[in-house]
From Swiss-Prot:
Gene3D superfamilies, A to Z: 4'-phosphopantetheinyl transferase domain
GO biological process entries: fatty acid biosynthetic process; lysine biosynthetic process via aminoadipic acid
Cofactor (UniProt): Mg(2+)
PANTHER family on file: L-AMINOADIPATE-SEMIALDEHYDE DEHYDROGENASE-PHOSPHOPANTETHEINYL TRANSFERASE (PTHR12215:SF10), PHOSPHOPANTETHEINE TRANSFERASE (PTHR12215)
Organism whose genome encodes this protein: Bacillus velezensis (strain DSM 23117 / BGSC 10A6 / LMG 26770 / FZB42) (Bacillus amyloliquefaciens subsp. plantarum)
Protein name, UniProt field: Holo-[acyl-carrier-protein] synthase
Sample GO molecular function, one term: magnesium ion binding
Signal peptide as annotated in the record: none
Length: 121
């Protein structure tokens, strides 16, 4: 049973501007494991990676129904990849049964969609 669906789109130049103005922006958005991957990327790829993870976490928060705030932070949500390279998403504090995520990039945008199938609160 579907609990929630969320989608988010972000302009890459907005993320690039945030990164140039706030050096700690990636640490606010990314978990330690995500940040470790981020540091290995080229500058161009860093922006795409950060924008994609930002969009995925925003999409998850919308699917969950709370948005990012008191109940859910960027640090509570972690993205990764399975053995085949497919993006996966997990939430640290929440009991999420099944979460599906899709992340995409273009020259100007990053977008993500999340479907939560079952959820225990």
């Amino acid at each position: 049973m579907i609990f929630g669906i969320g989608i988010d789109i972000v302009e890459l130049h907005r993320i690039e501007n945030m990164l140039s103005r706030q050096a700690r922006f990636p640490q606010r958005i990314l978990t330690e494991a995500e940040y470790a991957r981020f540091t290995l990327l080229s500058d161009k790829r860093k922006i795409e990676f950060l924008a994609g993870r930002f969009a995925a976490k925003e999409a998850f928060s919308k699917a969950y129904g709370t948005g990012i705030g008191k109940e859910l932070s960027f640090q509570d949500i972690e993205t990764g990849n399975d053995k085949a390279g497919k993006p996966v998403l997990a939430c640290a504090k929440l009991d999420c049964a099944t979460v599906h995520v899709s992340i995409t990039h273009t020259k100007e945008y990053a977008a993500a969609q999340v479907v939560i199938e079952r959820l225990s609160r």
